Regions:
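Short, acidic/polar
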Residues: 86-103, 181-195, 243-254, 339-348
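N-terminal carbohydrate-binding accessory modules
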Residues: 30-109, 143-147, 151
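Glycoside hydrolase catalytic-domain groove-lining segments
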Residues: 133-141, 147-150, 155, 223, ...
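Active-site neighborhood of glycoside hydrolase catalytic domains
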Residues: 216-239
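Substrate-binding cleft and catalytic face of glycoside hydrolase catalytic domains
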Residues: 72-73, 105-125, 136-214, 314-319, ...
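Aromatic-rich peripheral "rim/lid" segments of glycoside hydrolase catalytic domains that contact
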Residues: 19, 23-24, 28-36, 40, ...
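N-terminal Sec-pathway targeting helices
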Residues: 1-17
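A solvent-exposed, charged loop/short amphipathic helix patch at secondary-structure junctions
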Residues: 122-126, 172-177, 273-280, 317-339
Length: 388
């Protein structure tokens, strides 16, 4: 009897210890899911049944959380600032705008443009101007955005001659002049590459819409890519204009150091100023734009993303969507058409496996801004969708 009593007490002690351990695991939330799986319900799944749910076991009032199908998809907004102090701690527009973008759109990525300058399309000298933020200001802006849990994408833009001359028109007749330009461009860009690296930006474009220069000898581009890569540890991209989609892909775009290629997508869906029926926009967008981007991605053998897309608050939003001149400013406002254009783009992009992100032009930019408009609600709908 005494021996049996000892066994009973020993077994009781073991059971008590095991009970304490199991209780601790349950309270800590660290019980292996492989063991929990055998207790999962086999009830009818929630809508979007391809998505799993996770249980917050630390709280007794647990709420299923829907996992995003594409958690690395870049749900972006472009938020440009101009001036030497742009993006720094004194830039209140930057501070307020970051909060508004989060609340109104739920964007996870911020595209931060840096405006460089050259005097003409044949100048070999690239410089900063009084519209260019300092490297320190850019670093501060990156940290401010990241403190609000944004990912940051740094994009250099190039203004030519202080006018609306497009950077894609820059060209040279000799390789020597091209080399001079690339060296000067690197000297202007380098301090911002350093700032982006030190502040921890996640992604950086080596250039934007330099359409005619894209035909420069591949060694010049590969040298630029290597120079940036030696400093910046994050993802590298190049952003081309949509008109380049109709040309042969330059060999340097296959450089493995470029993780993806961005496209500025201002492709019109109509050839005359008219309001389009929102019901036809998703199919029209896929036919005229989606197929073109998919074909480019397949030929490139890399995923692509929309580094810039925008639609005016206008009844003619789908006609020459890049325009911002006096005629565009005189168009009748139509926030519903703008929102329908956003919706058509996102309906196609979010589910396209060839496309890994999208950035809209632009927060607080007149004509294009979605701030406090139906377009912002469309962004929020898609950026918080389980399909994103």
């Amino acid at each position: 009897m005494k021996r049996r009593s000892k066994h009973v007490y020993f077994i009781a002690f073991i059971l008590m210890v095991l009970g304490v351990l199991i209780q601790g695991l349950l309270l800590s939330g660290h019980i292996p899911l492989v063991h929990l799986s055998q207790f999962r319900s086999h009830a009818t799944p929630l809508p979007f049944q391809q998505y799993q749910t996770v249980v917050a076991s630390r709280d007794q009032n647990t709420t299923p959380v829907l996992r995003m199908q594409r958690p690395n998809f870049q749900t972006g907004m472009i938020f440009p600032q101009w001036g030497t102090n742009a993006y720094d701690s004194t830039d209140k527009n930057w501070q307020v705008g970051l909060n508004d973008i989060e609340n109104q759109t739920s964007a996870q990525w911020i595209e931060l443009p840096i405006n460089l300058y050259q005097s003409s399309v044949t100048s070999t000298q690239v410089t900063v101007s009084d519209m260019t933020p300092t490297p320190n200001a850019v670093a501060t802006g990156i940290r401010t955005a990241q403190a609000r849990y944004y990912h940051v994408f740094i994009v250099p833009l190039l203004s030519v001659g202080g006018t609306l001359t497009w950077s894609g028109s820059i060209q040279f007749s000799t390789t020597q002049h091209m080399q001079l330009w690339f060296d000067s461009y690197w000297q202007a860009l380098q301090p911002y590459v350093v700032a982006a690296a030190q502040a921890g930006a996640e992604e950086l474009a080596i250039g934007t819409e330099l359409e005619k220069l894209q035909l420069a000898p591949a060694p010049l581009w590969n040298q630029l890519i290597e120079r940036v890569h030696q400093i910046f540890p994050g993802k590298l991209t190049y952003d081309l204009n949509w008109s380049s989609l109709y040309y042969q892909i330059p060999p340097w775009m296959h450089n493995p150091l470029l993780t993806a290629v961005g496209v500025s997508v201002y492709i019109p869906l109509t050839d005359r100023p008219q309001r389009l029926d929102p019901a036809i926009l998703p199919g029209l967008w896929q036919e005229k734009i989606g197929k073109l981007l998919d074909s480019f991605s397949i030929q490139l053998t890399k995923q692509v993303f929309i580094s810039e897309i925008g639609y005016r608050d206008s009844a003619f939003a789908l006609y020459r969507p890049w325009e911002r001149d006096a005629q565009a400013q005189a168009e009748p406002a139509d926030p519903e058409e703008q929102a329908a254009a956003y919706d058509a783009a996102l309906m196609n992009v979010i589910v396209d496996p060839h496309i890994i992100g999208v950035y809209f032009w632009a927060w607080s930019v007149p004509l294009f801004e979605p701030n406090w408009k139906p377009a912002a609600k469309i962004l929020y709908k898609w950026y918080t969708s389980p399909q994103a």
